[in-house]
Amino acid sequence: YYFGRRNNGIYVPRFRNIGGKTNRKDFLRGYGYQGGGSRGSSTSEAAEILYGSQFKEEILKPGRWKVRLSGFGEILPYQDNRMTLDFNKTDKWGLPTVTFNASIKENELNMRKDMQQQAIEMLEKAGFTDVKGHDGDYALGLGIHEMGTARMGHNVKTSVLNRNNQVHEVPNVYVTDGSAMTSAGNVNPSLTYMALTARAADHAVKELKKMNL
C-alpha cells in the first residue's frame, strides 16, 4: 500500500456564498476543504494481550484506511484585530516588543459549524462509515498563512502600505508577504505573494531610475 494504486490528496473548492442557494444568512464569505486518505499504524490494530508469533503476525498487517477533510475559511478584517508596539516592555536591544490582540468572531464560529456539518454530509453520501466531526481549539497563527498587521490602503491613518506595497512613511521599504493583506481568504495565498513581490520589485526599479528612492 506504499506504492501503486492508492488514494491521494483532495481539494474541495469554495461552494458557500457564491450565489443562489449557496448563500448563507449566518456568515459571510466561505471556505474550502483540503484532505486525503491514509492507513493507520499496524500497531494500533494489534491487541495488547497478543505476544509471540501471533503478535508479530498482527503488526505486519496494515492499519485501516481513513479519510479526512479539513476546512479552511476566510477570516474577516476586524478593526479590533491588531498588532501594537508595547513601549513599556522592550527587548534586549531596547526596542518595543510586539503585542497581538486578535481572535475569530461570530462570523467565523458560524462558518466552522457549517464546515463540520458539510464535511460529515459529504463523506456519508460518498459511502464512508464511522464518520465523526471534530472542532478543535483554534487560535490565530495556527493556519500557517496568516495575514495582516501591515495592510495596504490609501489612508495613512488606517494602513501601513500604499498600493505599491511601500511603507507610507518610509518609501524605500517594501513589504510583500502576508502582512500586506487586508483579510485571510480560504485559498493558499503563496502565488499572490509572489505576484505582489514581482510587482513591487518592478516598481522599485522604476522609482530608483527616477531617483525617487
What does each model-identified segment do?
Residues 98-142:
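Mobile, glycine/GP-rich and aromatic-enriched active-site lid/loop segments adjacent to catalytic centers
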Residues 1-2, 133-142, 202-213:
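Active-site-proximal substrate-binding core of FAD-dependent oxidoreductases
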Residues 85, 119, 152, 177, ...:
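Hydrophobic, well-ordered secondary-structure elements that form the walls
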Residues 82, 119-129, 196-213:
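Internal hydrophobic alpha-helix adjacent to the cofactor/substrate pocket in enzyme cavities
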Residues 1-98, 106, 146, 168, ...:
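FAD cofactor-binding and catalytic pocket of flavoenzymes
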Residues 111, 144, 164-168, 189-193:
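Secondary-structure capping and boundary motifs in well-ordered enzyme cores
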Residues 129-167:
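Active-site Gly/Thr loop motif
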Residues 183-202:
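A conserved FAD-binding loop/helix module that cradles the flavin
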